[in-house]
């Protein structure tokens, strides 16, 4: 389901790059959250509870290892190099005969697929999902993790996520200044 949503967002945001693409993606996430909070078919803003706790540390660790390995192999593959070429120079890649539209949409789908795996793990870890928890600030925090680690680097994104996840614990004594650290 996440991959299908990635295709839809990818098609909608096809002509955008950089900051504008991030803004549209975050806006789409906010629209989905508001829909989940307000439509009766999704249960409104109620908590979806009763999810089995299947996220044990060893299971999550091995899922993470498999996902990171697949992403690493993807980045090193011909497909991954093509996506990197599009990222570096959109016009040159297009002039070289690369179907930029196809690669951008499929990359969105693949990214959304892995995000969906993360969401599934999170749901099983929390055993309940509250739509209001996935607000704009949470999206901005996730985007910050990627930016701090480096947008073109898989290892950097992992380090950025680990750093910003550990930062609240490291800065517990200075909790009133937490947002100041994020602004830097």
Locations of the language-model features?
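Transmembrane alpha-helices and adjacent helix-loop boundaries
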Residues: 1-184
